[in-house]
Structures are given as C-alpha cells and as structure tokens.
A protein has these predicted regions:
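Solvent-exposed residues in well-ordered beta-strands and their adjoining turns
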Residues: 12, 164-165, 262-264
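Bacterial Sec-dependent N-terminal signal peptides
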Residues: 1-21
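Hydrophobic/aromatic-rich core segments of domains that either
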Residues: 122-199
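A generic secondary-structure signal for well-formed alpha-helical elements
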Residues: 12, 63, 67, 71, ...
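Residues embedded in well-ordered secondary-structure elements
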Residues: 48, 150-152, 294
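Alpha-helical and coiled-coil interaction segments, frequently adjacent to or embedded
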Residues: 182-319
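Secondary-structure boundary elements
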Residues: 20-116, 122
Length: 319
C-alpha cells in the first residue's frame, strides 16, 4: 500500500465500545447483505432506531461490514487512472458538481460494495443525509506508514466523515473500521474495528490530519502531527496510551528507547522488533512507566512495539 487511502496492514481488533451499541450492531447484522437501492436500507434503519446516534451507528456498522476495500481501484488511482476531474466557474457551480459526484460515488459504492476511502465516506454521507443527519466528507492525510514519521502532511490521500449529532460534530472512519490488507495473502479481509466510530478528536488526530484544519476538532499543528509515532489499529481499539516517548523519532545517541504505556492488562506480553536486528525481544513489564528497549548501537531504522503479537506503534531511529 502506498499513499492513497492506505489501509494499515495489520489486524484491527475491537472491544472498547461494544456495550454502547451492541443492540444496534446485533439488529443491523440481521439486515440483508444487499438491497435493490439505498432506500431499502434507509427504511429499515428509520423503522428500527429513533436516536440519531443509533441511526449513524447502524449506517456505520452496515457499511463497514459489507463494503470491501478495492485494491484494484486503489492501484489505478495511484497511477492516475479512474480519477474524475471537473471544472467550475464559481463556488456555487463547484458545490453542485461536488454534490453530484459524491451522490454518484455513493450509489456506485452501494451497488458494487467495493470502494476506496472516498467511496466509504461518500456512502456514509449519503445515507446519513437520507436519514436527516448532517454529514460531511473530510479530506486529509492518513498517517499509515513509518516513512511518514517526521513528514509534514501534504496532499490529501484519505477521506473520512464528520457527522453532526446532538449539537456537536463527531468523527468516523469507515475505511479503517472495515478491515485490513493481509500481508500474507495480499488481499483485503473484513475485520470490523469500532474504535473509529465517534473517536475522541484527541485520539483521532494521532493518525488523521484534515486538509481543512477546522475538522481537527482539537488543537494540533502539522509539525506536531508529523512528529508523532505511527499508531496502529490495536492501539485505538485496545485503548492503549503511550505517554513516552511523545516523539516518533528516537535519537541513536540515546542508545535506548524508554517506553511508558498505559492500558495493559495482567498477562499481556509486550515485545519489540528492531528493523536492523533479527527476531523479537520480550520487554520487562515490571515498571510500565519505564520499559527499557536497548537500541544496540542502531543508527537508523525502526522500532516496532507489539502487545500480544499485535502491532501497536512504531518509532523511527534518526538524528
């Protein structure tokens, strides 16, 4: 995966938010897998749920569990094939054409049940609006590869949604919730991750940076975003918190990485992998605020942190 709508290449597990929306999820899971048109899905959701947050959750659940990430389309977009470009004379014409484009993309996604990030976001927006809920597609940068550590976010490569619920904007990313690209099979596999539904903006910004900074819904500069480590899906779904180091770049002069992490449970195993060294090493968890990871004289490369064999975060070693 490269830069366009990259789905982080590891399993995204979910457990944190299950209780709040368990009943909604269970009901939506009994819905048909396909409909003749979106109105069929909208009608079911309208009949089953009254609260706007439940309606949005139902949309999110159905889209994330039925729309497959389209790796072929992603490859085409990366080389400039399949891009739709339109011209406009003024803002009014631009708004009209953008609305038409998003509606067409949403309908195409609904029928084919295949998409990259823009298709997921367009469908979430379209279905939410049909249910009377204000929703917007947000464009920006997804921090999804270790090479991005230290890089200022540039051209938009990802899309997600803002939905206006109970007087405030909430952030959701159905693309990251849908699943992952398996490194073993090099194909998409559904694996629902509910952590990206109504995520706290202070967490969401750890790997999302919008082109229009009003969609941060918090305070974070591009430089601060660039300096962050790379966080993976399990970091969010398991509600881990790395308190140190706050920077994603570790100096080789330190000759060690001192890790402080919250959220581990009794029996958890934390391992680390140094890109310039063979094999995994198990960390001593006697002091979770002071986990020492020796860098063994490394002057470059990456440190990957795993909990129970799931990757959590990566740091870069550089001056």
């Amino acid at each position: 995966m490269k830069t366009v709508c990259t789905v982080i290449l590891l399993v995204f597990y979910s457990s944190i938010f299950a209780q709040d929306y368990k009943a909604v999820d269970e009901k939506v899971d009994r819905y048909p897998g396909t409909f003749d048109n979106p109105n069929g899905l909208v009608t079911l959701i309208s009949a089953d749920f009254e609260r706007p947050e439940e309606k949005v959750r139902a949309v999110f659940r159905w889209v994330a569990t039925h729309v497959q990430y389209d790796m072929f389309l992603e490859a085409q977009v990366e080389v400039g094939i399949g891009l739709k470009v339109f011209s406009y004379k003024d803002q009014k014409e631009k708004d009209i054409k953008e609305k038409k484009f998003l509606e067409e993309l949403a309908l195409k996604t609904f029928v084919s049940q295949r998409a990259i990030c823009h298709g997921y976001a367009a469908l979430i927006e379209y279905l939410s609006l049909k249910l009377g809920i204000t929703a917007k597609t947000v464009l920006g940068t997804l921090k999804s590869s270790p090479e991005q550590i230290g890089m200022i976010p540039g051209k938009a490569d990802h899309a997600w949604n803002g939905v206006f619920i109970n007087g405030k904007w909430e952030l959701i990313d159905a693309t990251l919730a849908a699943g992952y690209i398996s490194e073993r099979t090099e194909s998409f596999e559904f694996h629902y991750n509910e952590a990206f539904f109504f995520m706290n903006p202070n967490r969401f910004v750890l790997n999302h940076y919008p082109t229009d900074e009003k969609w941060l819904l918090t305070q974070k500069s591009k430089k601060e975003f660039a300096d962050l480590p790379l966080f993976f899906g399990s970091y969010f779904s398991k509600n881990y918190r790395i308190n140190a180091p706050l920077s994603g770049t570790v100096s080789p002069a330190d000759n060690q990485l001192v890790l402080s992490i919250e959220g581990l449970e009794f029996g958890d195993v934390l391992q680390y992998f140094l890109s310039e060294r063979p094999g995994f090493e198990q960390a001593n968890l006697s002091d979770l605020s002071n986990i020492i990871i020796p860098l063994d004289g490394m002057h470059s490369g990456y440190v990957s942190i795993f909990v129970n064999k799931d990757i959590v975060a990566m740091f870069k070693i550089a001056e």
